[in-house]
Amino acid sequence: MAIANKNIIFVAGLGGIGLDTSREIVKSGPKNLVILDRIDNPAAIAELKAINPKVTVTFYPYDVTVSVAESTKLLKVIFDKLKTVDLLINGAGILDDYQIERTIAVNFAGTVNTTTAIMAFWDKRKGGPGGVIANICSVTGFNAIYQVPVYSASKAAALSFTNSLAKLAPITGVTAYSINPGITKTTLVHKFNSWLDVEPRVAELLLEHPTQTSLQCAQNFVKAIEANQNGAIWKLDLGRLEAIEWTKHWDSGI
């Protein structure tokens, strides 16, 4: 997918990886970049507008833990204004295994709810034009960081959901792929809590190993958007972009 002249909704587009990715996206010249985030950041929005004044950058406050009905209501405002949306990026995430319910609500249920809401506008069974979804998951969806099992499981769930969305594309007209960053230098990983304090130094220990910058991750994210491969499981780690082959151990047969 060429980003130029497209209408893009980016949930959590002002976060660590999110903001750098938003910067790279506006450089590629979309028609509209609509950022949905929990906390407004006027300085960041102004910066994005300045990077490419030809791009219309707008912000709406949004908490992914709201109901599908509330999400649909906000999306209707956006669709009424833009008429069409080409790409939805679901990027909300928290890393704090003290907050069990919120971790699941943000990292998994939030992705499901926002995706479910946009189907009201995209699903070809309802006369919609289809669309593309990029879900930010994590390499912990492949193999857990076992000291943060709640976070890791929430990302594995989001990855499984995304893989199913891709298989449903012939029915819905909506394609999907996952973005799975490795350990990236953002505020998310500088300090966080392990489950039941099983490893108080988990953040410190992780950062002793090779990481990548959020800019490296963002640049590869844009490459994945441009590749636009339905069902792709992209690993963005150590500054590299790699498509993962998923091993099938069981099949429902339906």
UniProtKB/Swiss-Prot annotation:
The lineage of its organism: Eukaryota, Metazoa, Ecdysozoa, Arthropoda, Hexapoda. Substrate binds at S138. Homodimer. PANTHER family: 15-HYDROXYPROSTAGLANDIN DEHYDROGENASE [NAD(+)], ALCOHOL DEHYDROGENASE-RELATED. It catalyses: a primary alcohol + NAD(+) = an aldehyde + NADH + H(+); a secondary alcohol + NAD(+) = a ketone + NADH + H(+). The active site is at Y151 (proton acceptor). It is an enzyme of class 1 (oxidoreductase). NAD(+) binds at residues 10-33. Transmembrane segments: none annotated. This is Alcohol dehydrogenase 1.
